[in-house]
Amino acid sequence: MRALPGAGTVCDTAGVTERSRENRHPTGRGPRAGSVSAASRAVRHRRLAQHALSHNISDMNRSVPTDSQVSLDAIVGISDSDLMISQPYRLYVERLDPSRNMARYYAMSIEPNLFGDICLLRKWGRIGTKGQMMVHHFGQEEDAVRLFLDLLRQKRKRGYRPRPSLPKEKWPAEAEHESATSAPVPDPEGHLDLDEERNLDGEL
C-alpha cells in the first residue's frame, strides 16, 4: 500500500496480482504443475517412512504377554517338553540309631535346569539342620539315573530307610522330597555296590 497526497491510502494490488499469475497454471485453472509435484513427493516420502517404521516394529520384538497385537519381540519356539524328563526320580530316606545318637537324612532328585541339562541334586545332614547340598550335571538322563541308583544301593546298605508317614507339618524342613522314588527302581546289571568299588558319598 502507498499513500497519495490528498487521496488517503490506495492498495497496490499490481504486485500481488502479478505473483498470483506467475504461480497459476498456464490455462489459468490452478497452481503450476511444479509446485503440485513437489508437494506430492513430500507426502509420498512421509508415507513411505511411516510404512517402513511400522514394518520394522512388527517384524522385530514380538511378545504376546507385553502386547496384545504381538508387535514387540518374536516368540521363541520352546515347548515345555524340552525341559521335561521321562521319570522324576525322587528319594528321601533316614538313618536312625539312638544308641549312637545318630539321626541323619538323605534326599535325592533328578531335575532339569534352565539350560537343558539334567541335574542330580543331593542333600544330606542331621535331621533338624540345614545340612549340605551337591549338584551333579549330566548331558543325558541315563547317566543321572545310573548315579541315582548307585547311591540308592549304597544308602540301603548303610541302613537308610524311608521315613514312616507323618503329618506334613511334623516333617523336618529338609523333608522336601517324597519318601520313595516315583517309579519302581530297576535292578541295574552288574555289580554296582559303591561301598566296595568306590566311595562317592564319604560325607556320611
Curated annotation (Swiss-Prot):
This is Uncharacterized protein y4dW. It comes from the Bacteria. Residues 88-175 form the WGR domain. SMART domains: WGR. Keywords: Plasmid. Residues 166-179, 188-204 have a biased composition (Basic and acidic residues). InterPro entries: WGR_dom_sf (IPR036930), WGR_domain (IPR008893), YehF/YfeS-like_WGR (IPR049809). Residues 1-37, 159-204 are annotated as: Disordered. Residues 28-37 have a biased composition (Low complexity). It comes from Sinorhizobium fredii (strain NBRC 101917 / NGR234).
